[in-house]
From Swiss-Prot:
It is found in: Secreted. The lineage of its organism: Eukaryota, Amoebozoa, Evosea, Eumycetozoa, Dictyostelia. Residues 1-23 form the signal peptide. The keyword Signal applies. Its main location: secreted. This is Putative uncharacterized protein DDB_G0291626. Keywords: Glycoprotein, Secreted, Signal. It comes from Dictyostelium discoideum (Social amoeba).
Length: 71
C-alpha cells in the first residue's frame, strides 16, 4: 500500500514537473518570438534609414555635379 502511494506521488510530481517545463518552454518561445520581431523591426528601421541617407547622398552628389559643371 505504501509503495502504491509513493508511486502515485511520484507520478503526480512528474506531471507537475512536466507542466512546469512546458510553461517554461512556452515562455521562452514567446520571449524568442518577441526578440525576433524586435530584431526584424530594428533591421527594417536601420535599412530604411540607410536607404534614406543613400538617397540624400545621391541627390547631393547630383546637385554638386550640376553646380560644378554649370559654372
Amino acid at each position: 500500500m505504501t509503495l502504491l502511494i509513493i508511486l502515485i506521488l511520484k507520478y503526480l510530481l512528474c506531471l507537475e514537473n512536466l507542466k512546469n517545463i512546458s510553461l517554461q518552454i512556452s515562455k521562452n518561445n514567446t520571449i524568442n518570438n518577441i526578440n525576433c520581431e524586435n530584431n526584424f523591426n530594428n533591421i527594417n528601421k536601420s535599412y530604411s534609414i540607410n536607404e534614406s541617407n543613400s538617397a540624400k547622398n545621391d541627390f547631393v552628389k547630383f546637385l554638386k555635379f550640376i553646380f560644378f559643371h554649370a559654372f
